[in-house]
Amino acid sequence: MTFEKVGVIGAGAWGTALAQVAARAGLAVTLQAREPEIVAAINDTHENAVFLPGIALEPGIKAVADLADLADCDLILAVAPAQHLRAALTAFAPHRKAGAPVVLCSKGVEQGSLKLMTDVAAEALPGAPIAVLSGPSFAGEVARNLPAAVTLACEDEALGRAIAEAIAIPTFRPYTANDLIGAEAGGAVKNVLAIACGIVEGKGLGRNAHATVITRGFAELTRLAVALGARPETVAGLCGLGDLVLTCSSPQSRNMSVGLALGQGLTLEQALAGKVSVAEGVASAPAVRALARKVGVEAPICEAVAAILAGEVAVDAAIAGLLSRPLKPEA
């Protein structure tokens, strides 16, 4: 199976960066944006000044506003924010070319339903071949052609290889897997943990505490993913541990920057003020907490972040609660 035309749903930073990758791979790229001004700017100036300012876009990228304009695309990258993915895919469903696979590139748990993105896609696009792309990949670096590697998970392994081969370039390496739940669970939970790491930084609690949050957070991530049906070796790869380390280690991370502001004493409203791109962890935190409770998984760091974001507990009290937990075996 080969692909020639790629449609990208969502022209935020990550969607635009993936459009860059696909264009560099020699594919014809149609990038859909809801905002008419972004469509016009990309087509006229070859720049997404709102989400990726200062980065020249590949000439092979064409921007559109109407999802119907993706009807001739034989591969779809769905990059709408997690809480808007269902609406985007439902609107796109009548226009999907028969047999066109849909690669889910959004990370999160849907509020209310507590569904992962593959479940959302299966309901919005019945019968569509689904894959998941996830891994340590800041959009700005990918768009500037700096090296990155990701997980491309698809139950149909031949299809997964075909998609990986279609979008791979020397600076963007997709490693294939067949564990969709593992690929997406890691990406959903790591955003919540990145907020926790940001809080640690904002409070000045030191590198020891930072490393502890990453490590114990990864234990929470793994427990939840396995309870949902993932294999532990999947979340130990790029889509889980790799993405967690990146997102928890740089203020470039939208989620970590929110936590940093909270740790410095700002309110959530102040922390989010002026942010153009979505910090998925803010929306996913209550859903991750509810999902962990539903499947009986202990996730104290995710619980604390969700409680802080909901205004149920102050930052200092949440930290004190974590530090006073009973001692237990590490495993």
From Swiss-Prot:
Pathway: Membrane lipid metabolism; glycerophospholipid metabolism. The active site is at residue 190. InterPro entries: 6-PGluconate_DH-like_C_sf (IPR008927), 6PGD_dom2 (IPR013328), G3P_DH_NAD-dep (IPR006168), G3P_DH_NAD-dep_C (IPR006109), G3P_DH_NAD-dep_N (IPR011128), NAD(P)-bd_dom_sf (IPR036291). Belongs to the NAD-dependent glycerol-3-phosphate dehydrogenase family. HAMAP family: NAD_Glyc3P_dehydrog (MF_00394). Its EC number is 1.1.1.94. It is found in: Cytoplasm. Keywords: Cytoplasm, Lipid biosynthesis, Lipid metabolism, NAD, NADP, Nucleotide-binding, Oxidoreductase, Phospholipid biosynthesis, Phospholipid metabolism. GO terms for cellular component: cytosol. This is Glycerol-3-phosphate dehydrogenase [NAD(P)+]. GO terms for biological process: carbohydrate metabolic process; glycerol-3-phosphate biosynthetic process; glycerol-3-phosphate catabolic process; glycerophospholipid metabolic process; phospholipid biosynthetic process. It comes from Caulobacter vibrioides (strain ATCC 19089 / CIP 103742 / CB 15). NADPH binds at residues 14, 34, 107, 139, 254, 278, 280. It catalyses: sn-glycerol 3-phosphate + NAD(+) = dihydroxyacetone phosphate + NADH + H(+); sn-glycerol 3-phosphate + NADP(+) = dihydroxyacetone phosphate + NADPH + H(+). Sn-glycerol 3-phosphate binds at residues 107, 135, 137, 190, 243, 253-255. GO terms for molecular function: glycerol-3-phosphate dehydrogenase [NAD(P)+] activity; NAD binding. Catalyzes the reduction of the glycolytic intermediate dihydroxyacetone phosphate (DHAP) to sn-glycerol 3-phosphate (G3P), the key precursor for phospholipid synthesis. SUPFAM superfamilies: 6-phosphogluconate dehydrogenase C-terminal domain-like, NAD(P)-binding Rossmann-fold domains. Transmembrane segments: none annotated.
